[in-house]
Amino acid sequence: MTRSKSAPETTRAARQARIVAILSSAQVRSQSELAALLADEGIEVTQATLSRDLEELGAVKLRGADGGVGVYMVPEDGSPVRGVSGGTARLSRLLSELLVSADASANLAVLRTPPGAADYLASAIDRAALPYVVGTIAGDDTVFVAARDPMTGAELADTLEKLT
């Protein structure tokens, strides 16, 4: 079989790895912008393929706390980051981009996000495996974060705000 393409074909896994790397390091606002960044690396992709890749990777387009144009983000791979140098760096970045406000009650920190972003932020908090967090529950724009005793919800809210 002869190929008519001039550039070598990239495997789906390699292409998706590059997509994750790009979305982790740059604020990409559209599929066409992502396609251009991939093309700069010699990876040509159709819009349909890119759309499938983003869906398979679980990428979501979230608006920041300022309500501006959304950017694509890919959820973490599920491995905890506790004990890793700079393990909270990603959580800090997400908190600075998505945290609208923080409040507390008893042992709960109540975090407000732009609509649609709470689940993504809760997942990042869970995956950061912070020793003072028991777990999270997320709605559309609100995350309940349970503090581990003896920390209070107010102390937890303050700690999370300081990560921004």
UniProtKB/Swiss-Prot annotation:
Any GO BP: protein complex oligomerization
Pathway membership: Amino-acid biosynthesis; L-arginine biosynthesis [regulation]
Alphabetical UniProt keywords: Amino-acid biosynthesis, Arginine biosynthesis, Cytoplasm, DNA-binding, Repressor, Transcription, Transcription regulation
Tagged with keyword Transcription: yes
Any one Pfam family match given in the protein's UniProt record, by short name: Arg_repressor
Gene Ontology terms: cellular component: cytoplasm
GO molecular function: arginine binding; DNA binding; DNA-binding transcription factor activity
Top-level taxon: Bacteria
Intracellular or extracellular location(s): Cytoplasm
Family: Belongs to the ArgR family.
Classification via PANTHER family: ARGININE REPRESSOR
Function: Regulates arginine biosynthesis genes.
Record-linked HAMAP family: Arg_repressor
Identification of the protein by name: Arginine repressor
Gene that this sequence comes from: argR
